[in-house]
Amino acid sequence: MPLPKVEMTIFETILARRSVRRYKARKVDRTTVSILLEAAVHAPTAIHQEPWAFVVIQDKVLLRSLSDQAKPLFVAEAQEKGLEHAGHSFDIFKYPDFNIFYDATTLILICGRTSAPSYSADCWLAAENLMLAACAMGLGSCVVGSALPALNTPKTKVLLNIPENFITVAPIIVGYPDDEIVPVMRKNPVILANIPATQHG
């Protein structure tokens, strides 16, 4: 597969990536999606299981329908876990016009085969590869964890052709940012221990 030419180094891409929640209406073409998936499957994987599979959704009506299904399920799950009492507010999820996918034109689901011992970790490594590739290509991305309760219902899995032995691990929206992407500052690494080599080690 011909790969796009990018100007950023890998470290510049890591520092530039951030979650994007405002998108242009411009669609992401299928070739670009294929490149993102190619980046994803080159992630590290435990004992070479490669337990991932993907669903690509670009249908606006379906995306809105999934958003509407996800909002009440996510709020119910958050309340059950007591997240509102932990200082989180979920009022925006109660607004009919709020789209949890932020009107992005593309949603990519990274699904994991649950029989693989490290399927969740592997899928998240694939997710980071995908998001870094998107950033390097001038695209924005964002993990939409609030969609998970809806995406993993039996009804939705049948609709999206997700087998019973797979679950959605990382729902990622992708699109062209409607704003300038400004890198965010992060805290310095918390080093719990720094054990130098001994004289004989």
Question: What is the meaning of each model-derived region?
Answer:
Residues 2-6, 13-20, 94-95, 167-201:
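C-terminal helix-cap and adjacent tail motif
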Residues 23, 116-120, 181:
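A generic structural signal for short coil/turn motifs at secondary-structure boundaries
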Residues 40, 108, 113-158:
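Small-aliphatic-rich amphipathic alpha-helix that forms the alpha element of a beta-alpha
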Residues 50-121:
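Glycine/small-residue-rich phosphate/adenosyl-binding loop
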